[in-house]
Each structure stands twice: as C-alpha cells, then as structure tokens.
C-alpha cells in the first residue's frame, strides 16, 4: 500500500468531521491530492508525504503548467495541498509546513456570468408547459432564480421544508448547514401547481418520497439533469451565453445588489460564511453603475 493512502484517508475523515465540508468539496480535495500522490509515487517513490519539501511541490506545480492545466485549476490544487499540510501540522505529523511558501498563480478576478432580467423571463417563458416535465422544470427554474439556491440545495429540497404560508424554504447548504431562504410568490405558485397537479402522478422511488423534484422513475433529479434542462431552454431561445444552474444564483444576487439590497442580507440568503465571498457582487454593481454613466451621462 502506498505511504500516501492512510494519510489521505485520515485527511478525508478530518475534512468531514472536523471541517464539516460537503461530500462534493471532500471529493474535490481527494481528487486533487491524488494528483500529487501519483506524481510523487512516479517521480520520487522513496519520499513519503511527511518527507515532501517545498522543492518537490514546486516541481509538481511546474508539471501542471506543462500539462496546460489552467491557472484557476492550479490555484485550486495548491489550495488543497496547503489544507493537507495544515492537517499534518495539526496532527503533529510534521514540524514544518513545506507548502507554506508555495506560490499560487496570480489570477485576475473573474466575475461570474449573469443573465439580465429579460433573459431570465425569456428562459422561463420558453418552457413548454404542455410537456410532462414542463411544470416541474418551470417550478425548478423559478425556485433557482427566486431564492438563489445552489443546484445541490435545489435537488435536495424536500416537501416538508417548504413553508408556503410564510414564504420561506429551509435548505441544507455546504457542510450540512441549514438556513431559511425567502421564496417569491411566483415560484411558490409554480411549485404548488407541480406538486398538486403533476407530481402526484409519479410513484416516488423508495427513499425519495419527500424530494420535491423527481424524474420519471420517481427519483430525485441529478445535478447533471438540471444542467441539461437549463442548456435546452437556453438553446431554445437562441441565447449565446454559457448558462448553468449557478448562473441563476449569480443573477439572483446581482439583481438584488443592483436593486440596492444590503450586502449582509444577500450573504445570509446565499449561505456564504464570509462577507468577502459576497463582495464580488459589489464589483458587478460597480460595472453596472459605470454602464449607466456611459449610457446616460452627457459627457462620455
């Protein structure tokens, strides 16, 4: 067995128990660390994880660049490496952190893609309600835009967590953290139509009885299925943008900030732990204000 295997398993356990990270985040860390372990086993087979030096890590990062792996992916992998060696320090497995001086690529701040409100409306109105899944898809996309949910939060939404009388959803976010999120009347209307008139004709699979959005076999929708549904509707209106479920979330936040919403309130609704994550939307807002100035001010 590789000298990396037991430590990577312990790291995975630490991320789950101590850090309370989601399964998706843990999987991402695991896959990135496996890249490093494979590189070390191939090029420095006698070097255990606790013997790795800064120079080893720099060789590995250089190999990523040679494979033309994007700077954003490199930065994510380096972040995972730093987390792993912080864990080894925490466990007293090493006395010095070899990743401490490991440099990440300098990244320009990439602002997320957004949809305008008319584009959102066109996508929603393009959903054919005459098709069996039409009302489900409309309810689903209305919910994404109305509440700014992550796609994982959307597909995990349960009927018992919809509080229609007060206009809130209880969602399970990253790290299994719960939060209450407001939902608009239009989204609630389409959810109600879907549940009362269409979902009742589907026999839920065992263990999937409480999930709101089901496929034809009665199982909750997958992330990939939601992505494909959105791609189909974007193509239907001829919109040449790279739109994903996360685009609806970004658009939700952007439109709130452009409308003057308090950033702390937006942070709470998005489920961001840190306000700095939410602050990216203030940059979007400044771009919007600059656009208004250029369009309407008499002196260009």
Where are these regions (language model features)?
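Conserved catalytic core of the tyrosine transesterase superfamily
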Residues: 1-300
